[in-house]
Design a protein with these regions (language model features):
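Adenylate-forming
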Residues: 12, 63-64, 88, 105
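Structural core segment of the AMP-binding/adenylate-forming
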Residues: 1-62, 176
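Conserved AMP-binding A3 loop
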Residues: 83-107
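Conserved S/T- and glycine-rich ATP-binding loop of Class I adenylate-forming
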Residues: 21, 82, 88-91, 124, ...
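Short loop/turn segments at beta->alpha junctions
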Residues: 5-8, 101, 159
Length: 177
């Protein structure tokens, strides 16, 4: 997320023993990451998905083009392995790391099917920055598992009138904000 500062990145990298950062290639993000690296010894690789690929970052798209064909590992992941980690908002101190296993997405079938009342014909929009857990549980797992279409609106600044215009123009049928 573009909201993390150098301090936030250092804390999270060290708390989670992060090995690689994959990020949008925008200076508001990459400058903070670059500044955090001297205090983030576990990080070995930086990858930018563009549009810019700063010095010290690998180009995600070139990496995909040069990648060898996928080979299934001898020992694939199990449902109990860590799939995803969130950090809490830190309202009562430093953010706390919360790990989820590979069964976590299944819990959000209920979110998409019953809370959002989604069908295969639904077009769903969740308003949340990808740095927040809501971005995952509110617009990916239960929604896609349930077969709904997910509307993505990448906006620089939250502007209610622009959101309402997108909802109207694209006939969004479900909203979570």
């Amino acid at each position: 997320t573009h909201l993390l500062t150098k301090k936030d990145i250092v804390y999270r990298c060290n708390a989670a023993d992060i090995k690689m950062i994959v990020c949008a290639g925008e200076s508001v993000i990459t400058d903070h990451i670059t500044a955090a690296m001297p205090e983030s010894p576990s990080v070995k690789r930086l990858v930018s998905v563009g549009p810019e690929v700063p010095e010290g970052f690998e180009d995600f798209h070139k990496g995909i083009e040069a990648a060898a064909p996928f080979v299934k590992p001898e020992h694939p992941n199990t449902n109990d392995d860590i799939s995803l980690m969130y950090f809490t908002s830190g309202t009562t101190g430093e953010p706390k790391m919360v790990a989820h296993d590979f069964t976590y997405p299944l819990g959000h079938i209920v979110t998409g099917s019953f809370w959002h009342n989604l069908k295969e014909s639904s077009l769903h929009l969740t308003i949340a920055d990808t740095g927040w857990g809501k971005a995952v549980w509110g617009k990916l797992y239960g929604q896609w598992i349930g077969g709904a279409n997910v509307f993505v609106y990448d906006h620089e600044k939250f502007t209610p009138a622009a959101i309402l215009e997108k909802i109207q123009d694209y006939h969004v049928t479900s909203l979570c904000a």
